[in-house]
Amino acid sequence: MATANKNLSNYDKNTIPNAKNFRFGIVISEWNDHITEGLYSGVIEALTDCGALHKNIIRWNVPGSFELIYGAKKMIETQKPDVVITIGCVIKGETMHFEFVCEGVTQGIKDLNVLSDIPTIFCLLTDNTEQQSIDRSGGTHGNKGTEAAIAAIKMAYLREQANLGFHQSDKLLKTNQLQIEGLPLKIQE
């Protein structure tokens, strides 16, 4: 498992933009809710720790992970958040259902990112066992929800700066690099 030697909840707040002015959409699967609610807690804790306001966080529930795609699409269209976080958990069983759902959700979220101006963050646990999911949703490996929240803040900031055209702030435009709170992000020409 890739996270065996990494705590997903660790981040350096000094490297993350302030989230106060961003609107966050969260679409969460009700399936495996004992896992997804843990991921949601990690998302909320990290967002608020980085300045997000509760009034700027919208939550929608969907029945399962496959429905995350439609939920995120509709949230983007109707709520106009700066970023959407999709939260789900698929645990491998005895049939091919696991592979089909994981592939479909992965491709669907990828498609939203390609076709929409709003970033969609992929917080879908795809584990072989329930214990692996527990370990990654607030257990021994930290919380993948925390990692997703930090990615969401960074992507909302990137979107904001890209929409400004990178030239609006002299502080941001430095030798073809965008500064994210002191971290360089190289711009490809």
Swiss-Prot record:
Binding of 5-amino-6-(D-ribitylamino)uracil, residues: 31, 65-67, 89-91, 122
Active site residues per record: 97
A Pfam family matched in the record: DMRL_synthase
Alphabetical list of InterPro entries matching this protein: LS, LS/RS, LS/RS_sf
EC id: 2.5.1.78
Gene Ontology cellular component list: cytosol; riboflavin synthase complex
Record-linked SUPFAM superfamilies: Lumazine synthase
UniProt GO MF annotations: 6,7-dimethyl-8-ribityllumazine synthase activity
Record key words, sorted: Riboflavin biosynthesis, Transferase
Source organism, top-level taxon: Bacteria
CDD domains: Lumazine_synthase-I
Catalytic activity: (2S)-2-hydroxy-3-oxobutyl phosphate + 5-amino-6-(D-ribitylamino)uracil = 6,7-dimethyl-8-(1-D-ribityl)lumazine + phosphate + 2 H2O + H(+)
Pathway assigned to this chain's UniProt record: Cofactor biosynthesis; riboflavin biosynthesis; riboflavin from 2-hydroxy-3-oxobutyl phosphate and 5-amino-6-(D-ribitylamino)uracil: step 1/2
A biological process from GO: riboflavin biosynthetic process
Annotated positions binding (2S)-2-hydroxy-3-oxobutyl phosphate: 94-95, 136
Membership in a protein family: Belongs to the DMRL synthase family.
Function: Catalyzes the formation of 6,7-dimethyl-8-ribityllumazine by condensation of 5-amino-6-(D-ribitylamino)uracil with 3,4-dihydroxy-2-butanone 4-phosphate. This is the penultimate step in the biosynthesis of riboflavin.
Protein name stated in the entry: 6,7-dimethyl-8-ribityllumazine synthase
